[in-house]
Amino acid sequence: MLTIDIHTHIIPEHIPDYTKKFGYGDFIHLDHHKPCCARMMKGDKFFREIEDNCWSPEKRMDECAHHHVDVQVLSTIPVMFSYWSKPKDCLEVSQFLNDHIAGIVAKYPKKFIGLGTIPMQDPAMAIKELERCKQIGLAGIQIGSHVNDWNLNATELFSIFEACSKLDMALFVHPWDMMGEQKMTKYWLPWLVGMPAETSLAICSMIFGGVFERLPPAVPDHGADGPVY
């Protein structure tokens, strides 16, 4: 029996400075300030420090062997979703990230499965990128627990879920942009409280909003902090 870790985030080692390119916003880029580590920067603000296992598939395979994990399912770090940005700019970021993951999967097909990201704030554009994700060998997509002001039962989003079903693409829902974050500045509360709350918001919106009733049968599976369909 294979041991598969479905919740593993990855980003490219080098990311364009989209804030400078597009002229607005706090897009993520990396500051490689020392060997084997980098600072994730939101515009000019520090976000998080990461190690090389966040971008190196070879380092990941070594760690997987140590922990007896056979396969990792790769998805981007949710802060990269960029749903707040202009759709065409979000599409460019998404395609860059999706091509990166697809390249790793193509190079190590027995070790990695890939999930894409799409510009959910523009459903028509999102579906086109979803179709492209299928073409380049990704197994599904990762989406946020909400899309700006839309919860996941929003009628605007249903066509995306319908397209996932028709294309047989998995849907991994990951909490992000946590509610009440301004009140939770200590004790890692955005992760300990905000992420479970966002997950509840997402799954309840889909259940009570009748999303599953309108789609072919699906079995939700709750991972570390996000349901998979």
At which residue positions do the language-model features occur?
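Helix-coil boundary/capping segments in enzymes
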Residues: 1-229
